[in-house]
């Protein structure tokens, strides 16, 4: 059996088309959705991510603002800039690209973003609201994964799901969203004693640790859905995920590739979150 491919590029194209239609409708009413992206320092990977986010905004009718600062920017100056953006009615989403230089407290920076503009879904108010099932914003990567399940009709209610990874950005919110959808969820991590014992029982496995080949074919239940959130490089420097794709695709029922799987969905859901913020702001101003 060869797994069916979950194509993140194709689904992203559909969802971005819908986002562009909503953006055009808002713009016609004088409320063009606006996203501000802040980059501090010269991390090459961060620069690529920011460029892709700005391009996605431009391609889909959003107003975008990029603030690029040297790594020497003070924490106080960054917090002051966030405060300005919080009060700017043209801006509906604020994103600070992580990681930040060591002298800046990323937790303090995230908490400085107004919860109603926290389109990454990282603010403690949104993280806490996710626990109740009613967040203003869901973190973009796990939100994108949920859209993949939905688009392919993958049943979550009653399913056994394993999330490998416990980060605040992917692992923990992914587990909460699966739980909210009715799955029975196990979170595995670096201290898990027998990872394979958990994954072999899982109908759904989400790998999100940033470690090559953390999941191999012998660890996967036949017919399971495998979502690869990892972004790594193989020995030849080629982009790869956390899953041994060549082996696992012969066992799984569904699988996401890297690249072209979860990655495009992350930026797409950032657009969706920004649109939802702009729609709320337009409704409040009406």
Curated annotation (Swiss-Prot):
GO terms for biological process: L-histidine biosynthetic process; methionine biosynthetic process; purine nucleotide biosynthetic process; tetrahydrofolate interconversion. Its EC number is 1.5.1.5, 3.5.4.9. GO terms for cellular component: cytosol. It comes from the Bacteria. Keywords: Amino-acid biosynthesis, Histidine biosynthesis, Hydrolase, Methionine biosynthesis, Multifunctional enzyme, NADP, One-carbon metabolism, Oxidoreductase, Purine biosynthesis. CDD domains: NAD_bind_m-THF_DH_Cyclohyd (cd01080). InterPro entries: Aminoacid_DH-like_N_sf (IPR046346), NAD(P)-bd_dom_sf (IPR036291), THF_DH/CycHdrlase (IPR000672), THF_DH/CycHdrlase_cat_dom (IPR020630), THF_DH/CycHdrlase_CS (IPR020867), THF_DH/CycHdrlase_NAD-bd_dom (IPR020631). The keyword Hydrolase applies. Catalyzes the oxidation of 5,10-methylenetetrahydrofolate to 5,10-methenyltetrahydrofolate and then the hydrolysis of 5,10-methenyltetrahydrofolate to 10-formyltetrahydrofolate. Belongs to the tetrahydrofolate dehydrogenase/cyclohydrolase family. HAMAP family: THF_DHG_CYH (MF_01576). This is Bifunctional protein FolD. It comes from Burkholderia cenocepacia (strain ATCC BAA-245 / DSM 16553 / LMG 16656 / NCTC 13227 / J2315 / CF5610) (Burkholderia cepacia (strain J2315)).
